[in-house]
From Swiss-Prot:
Annotated source species: Homo sapiens (Human)
ZnF MYND-type span: 515-551
Domain notes: The TAFH domain mediates interaction with transcription regulators. Nervy homology region 2 (NHR2) mediates homo- and possibly heterotypic oligomerization by forming a four-helix bundle tetrameric structure.
Record-given protein name: Protein CBFA2T1
Effect the entry attributes to changing H547A: Causes unfolding of the MYND-type zinc finger domain
Biased composition (Pro residues): 289-298
Polar residues composition-biased segments: 63-86, 271-285, 557-576
GO cellular component: nuclear matrix; nucleoplasm; nucleus
Molecular function via GO: DNA binding; DNA-binding transcription factor binding; transcription corepressor activity; zinc ion binding
Tissues expressed in: Most abundantly expressed in brain. Lower levels in lung, heart, testis and ovary.
Length: 604
């Protein structure tokens, strides 16, 4: 009994020591309750420093930032299974921080976490998507391609948010993206950023510097196939790859019997990025022996992806697309993007493609039109230069002819003078004049063209002068006609006004029944003189200021006229005439109102 207890304690001490060496002391300390460590715990630092050779300094360990080491020791949940490891070098959260509570069964963990193959596939899709965007911008124009490349680098460097990237990309290309682009970037961009951060830390640079130096690994079409999703990791050190220690060897005999049923699941928990992490130097197993040389990375990645997909998703049948991607030869990876794009274009996308092509054709037509205009301007400038050159050549020729027509003696003396170089210059100029310049039209054709142009100008000026004179004549005639009409209208208006005034005056003078104030029909008579007639008392009062001066005088004149009339009737033999022949002393305002008064007073 004592020996059994001693053997048990010896075994437990060995297990605890082994766990301390391997950094999994939590697993040994608490086998029955749920326990997990954060990726940036000191245990990770210890394990990383122990597993990394002395030639490669470990990446900086900051408690605030997440760990990006290629190997993160994962703890056990009830000692049954590992939490999924990093995707392409980016650690995934342990089981204690997953979406739901961890369970003791491996199937629940498979449902909660994403398989490494799926993560590698999504990362490859993201790289292929960014490369396609950059190529699409280059197809439009080099300037737009440069802008798209800057936007992609800013998105990966986290200097641009996904929404800003989406809006600026649409503004640069004038081409709307699909609706699933923003969710796709939000879901898969952190994988690429963690991978970039990991590679930058290994290279002792910040992500912006590393991406600026290794930009071709992100935007090169040859590195965006699914099997080459971790080419960014391969660029740091091609011969310094190490393998994460096998989980069965790492945890030893402490595995519970539940996992003995599926031993093939052990390699599937290691992502392709962890198998070939970019660490310098050789890697060592927990027993201190170096790992054997691994086979080519692509072969391992394909096997890992296929096995992980088969065992983790065994409850669902693989889709036709997955089988096609898995069984496609590696030589056809360059044409995979074109085939997928050709087969996945919808009617709306075809309409957008045609719209884009129409826009490109319109741009080409505009460029052709601008080029044609530029050539026309250049041709006109060349013609103007030729005309000016011919003009000066003709003037110089005329001047030379005049000089030649001068004195022959002076020319003879100049020819005999050895100092004067004029004959040589004249010969050179004569040779220049008679030698036709290459590309220039003969002078006769230019003269005819000038004469034709001048004739056209003269005809145009003549026609213009005729048109101007005709327009002036028509305008003058129109002004004269309108002026005559206006004068006739004014004269007619004046004549009509004069006739109306005379008619009114004559009507007032001829009417004996009209009012002396307003000219209407009179109904009353002035009681003072019985001569003035008014239409009413109002008009009589209005006219009294004028009428009272003559009202009494008229009455006195009538009384004085009555007295001689009576005396003449007594002495009929006197020489005085009849009272009808004697004019009154004072005449009324008008002769018409005085007539009835005379008629009325005569019988008296």
């Amino acid at each position: 009994m004592i020996s059994v207890k001693r053997n048990t304690w010896r075994a437990l001490s060995l297990v605890i020591g082994d766990c301390r060496k391997k950094g999994n002391f939590e697993y040994c300390q608490d086998r029955t309750e749920k326990h997990s460590t954060m990726p940036d715990s000191p245990v990770d630092v210890k394990t990383q420093s122990r597993l990394t050779p002395p030639t490669m300094p470990p990446p900086p360990t900051t408690q605030g930032a997440p760990r990006t080491s290629s190997f993160t020791p994962t703890t056990l949940t009830n000692g049954t299974s590992h939490s999924p490891t990093a995707l392409n070098g980016a650690p995934s959260p342990p089981n204690g921080f997953s979406n739901g509570p961890s369970s003791s069964s491996s199937s629940s963990l498979a449902n909660q976490q994403l398989p490494p193959a799926c993560g590698a596939r999504q990362l490859s899709k993201l790289k292929r998507f960014l490369t396609t965007l950059q190529q699409f911008g280059n197809d439009i124009s080099p300037e737009i391609g440069e802008r798209v490349r800057t936007l992609v680098l800013g998105l990966v460097n986290s200097t641009l948010t996904i929404e800003e990237f989406h809006s600026k990309l649409q503004e640069a290309t004038n081409f709307p993206l699909r609706p699933f682009v923003i969710p796709f970037l939000k879901a898969n961009l952190p994988l690429l950023q963690r991978e970039l951060l990991h590679c930058a830390r290994l290279a002792k640079q910040n992500p912006a510097q590393y991406l600026a130096q290794h930009e071709q690994l992100l935007l090169d079409a040859s590195t965006t196939s699914p099997v080459d999703s971790s080419e960014l990791l391969l660029d740091v050190n091609e011969n310094g790859k190490r393998r994460t220690p096998d989980r069965t060897k790492e945890n030893g005999f402490d595995r519970e019997p539940l996992h003995s049923e599926h031993p093939s699941k052990r390699p599937c928990t290691i992502s392709p990025g962890q198998r070939y992490s970019p660490n310098n130097g050789l890697s060592y197993q927990p027993n201190g022996l170096p790992h054997p040389t691994p086979p080519p990375p692509q072969h391992y990645r394909l096997d890992d992806m296929a096995i992980a997909h088969h065992y983790r998703d065994s409850y669902r049948h693989p889709s036709h697309r997955d089988l096609r991607d898995r069984n496609r030869p590696m030589g056809l990876h360059g044409t995979r993007q074109e085939e997928m794009i050709d087969h996945r274009l919808t009617d709306r996308e075809w309409a957008e493609e045609w719209k884009h092509l129409d826009h490109l054709l319109n741009c080409i037509m505009d460029m052709v039109e601008k080029t044609r205009r530029s050539l026309t301007v250049l041709r006109r400038c060349q013609e103007a230069d030729r005309e000016e050159l011919n003009y000066w050549i003709r003037r110089y020729s005329d001047a030379e002819d005049l000089k030649k027509g001068g004195g022959s003696s002076s020319s003879h003396s100049r020819q005999q003078s050895p100092v004067n170089p004029d004959p040589v210059a004249l010969d050179a100029h004569r040779e220049f004049l008679h030698r036709p310049a290459s590309g220039y039209v003969p002078e006769e054709i230019w003269k005819k063209a000038e004469e034709a142009v001048n004739e056209v100008k003269r005809q145009a000026m003549t026609e213009l002068q005729k048109a101007v004179s005709e327009a002036e004549r028509k305008a003058h005639d129109m002004i004269t006609t309108e002026r005559a009409k206006m004068e006739r209208t004014v004269a007619e208006a004046k004549r009509q006004a004069a006739e109306d005034a005379l008619a009114v005056i004559n009507q007032q003078e001829d009417s004996s029944e009209s009012c002396w104030n307003c000219g209407r029909k009179a109904s009353e008579t002035c009681s003072g003189c019985n001569t003035a007639r008014y239409c009413g008392s109002f008009c009589q009062h209005k006219d009294w200021e004028k009428h009272h001066h003559i009202c009494g005088q008229t009455l006195q004149a009538q009384q004085q006229g009555d007295t001689p009339a009576v005396s003449s009737s007594v002495t009929p033999n006197s020489g005085a005439g009849s009272p009808m022949d004697t004019p009154p002393a004072a005449t009324p305002r008008s002769t018409t109102p005085g007539t009835p008064s005379t008629i009325e007073t005569t019988p008296r």
